[in-house]
C-alpha cells in the first residue's frame, strides 16, 4: 500500500531537502500543512504568501515526477482558501486537504466550481451519512475517513464502497498504529486509488506493540498474522492524560485585529 508521509519540516532543514528524502525513501507523496498553529496571532494574507513559497520548494524537492500534497487545516476563510488553491495549481499537488471548515460540507459545491486542484476532506467526519452529499455529488476527490472517527471497520467499509462507485479515492487519516493496521487491510480490498498516511515517515517506534505493521521501502504491507496483524502489549501502555475533571482547550488563534479565527 503506497504511503503519504506527514512530517513537519525539522529545524535547520530546507523543505525541499526533506521532501526529496521522503520520495527517495520510497514514499508515494510528501504532505505539508499551512502550519499556523505555532503562534496565537496569524495574518492570513502573509500566511498565504508564505505557504505558496513553501509549496514551490516542496515541488522542487519531490521533482517533476514526485507527488506532494498540503493540508489547509480548515484555517483559511473562503476567499483565501480559493486564492491559495488556485496559486498552487500549477505546482500540481496530489490533493489539497481541508480547505475550509468542515461544519458545512455543502459549501464544497462552491469550492468545486472555483478551484481545479484535487480536493481531500473528511478526517473530522463521522459515519456514512456525513459523507453522502460529498461523495454522491462528486464534490471531493479523496476521502480522509478514519476508522475510530467513523465508528469501526464495518462503517469504514461502507464509506469505502460508496467512494469506489463514485471514483473517490481513500487517504485514511492517521489516528494511531492500531487503527492504521486495520486500515491497511481495508484499503488493500479497495479497487480505487488509496494512500496510507504515516506520521514522521513511519519511523517512530511504538513501544506498546510487540509486533507492528510491515513497512518496507515506504510501503505498508498486509501480513498473515492473526487479527489486524499487530500485537498489543498492555503492560507497556502509559496514561497520557486524565480528563475527568478538566480538559485542555484547543489553541485559540486570532487575527491581527484581535478577532478569533478557526484553528
Where are the predicted features?
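Pocket-edge structural micro-motifs
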Residues: 2-4, 217, 224, 234, ...
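Alpha-helical structural motif
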Residues: 54, 179, 233-236
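Short leucine-rich amphipathic alpha-helices used at interfaces
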Residues: 38, 204, 210, 254, ...
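Structural signal for hydrophobic packing residues in well-ordered secondary-structure cores
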Residues: 59-62, 92, 187-191, 241-244
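Shared catalytic-loop signature of beta/alpha-barrel
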Residues: 86, 92-95, 103-227, 231
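Metal-dependent enolase-superfamily TIM-barrel catalytic cores that perform enediolate-based chemistry
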Residues: 2-109
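Extended hydrophobic packing segments that form well-structured cores
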Residues: 228-263
Amino acid at each position: 500500500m503506497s504511503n503519504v508521509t506527514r512530517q513537519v519540516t525539522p529545524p535547520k532543514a530546507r523543505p525541499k531537502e526533506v521532501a526529496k528524502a521522503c520520495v527517495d525513501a520510497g514514499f508515494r507523496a510528501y504532505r505539508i500543512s499551512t502550519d499556523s498553529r505555532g503562534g496565537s496571532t496569524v495574518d492570513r494574507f502573509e500566511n498565504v504568501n508564505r505557504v505558496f513559497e513553501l509549496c514551490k520548494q516542496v515541488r522542487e524537492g519531490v521533482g517533476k515526477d514526485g507527488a506532494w500534497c498540503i493540508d489547509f487545516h480548515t484555517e483559511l476563510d473562503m476567499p483565501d482558501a480559493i486564492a491559495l488553491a488556485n496559486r498552487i495549481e500549477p505546482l500540481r499537488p496530489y490533493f489539497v486537504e481541508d480547505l475550509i471548515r468542515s461544519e458545512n460540507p455543502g459549501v464544497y459545491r462552491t469550492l468545486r466550481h472555483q478551484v481545479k486542484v484535487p480536493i481531500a476532506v473528511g478526517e473530522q467526519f463521522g459515519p456514512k451519512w456525513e459523507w453522502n452529499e460529498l461523495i454522491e455529488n462528486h464534490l471531493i476527490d479523496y476521502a480522509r475517513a478514519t476508522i475510530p472517527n467513523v465508528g469501526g471497520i464495518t462503517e469504514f467499509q461502507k464509506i469505502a464502497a460508496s467512494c469506489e462507485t463514485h471514483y473517490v479515492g481513500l487517504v485514511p487519516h492517521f489516528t494511531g498504529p492500531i487503527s492504521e493496521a486495520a486500515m491497511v487491510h481495508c484499503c488493500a480490498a479497495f479497487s480505487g486509488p488509496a494512500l496510507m498516511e504515516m506520521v514522521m515517515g513511519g519511523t517512530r517506534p511504538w513501544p506498546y506493540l510487540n509486533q507492528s505493521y510491515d513497512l518496507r521501502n515506504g510501503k505498508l504491507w498486509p501480513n498473515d498474522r492473526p487479527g489486524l496483524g499487530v500485537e498489543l502489549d498492555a503492560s507497556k501502555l502509559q496514561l497520557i492524560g486524565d480528563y475527568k475533571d478538566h480538559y485542555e482547550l484547543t489553541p485559540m488563534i486570532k487575527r491581527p485585529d484581535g478577532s478569533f479565527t478557526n484553528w
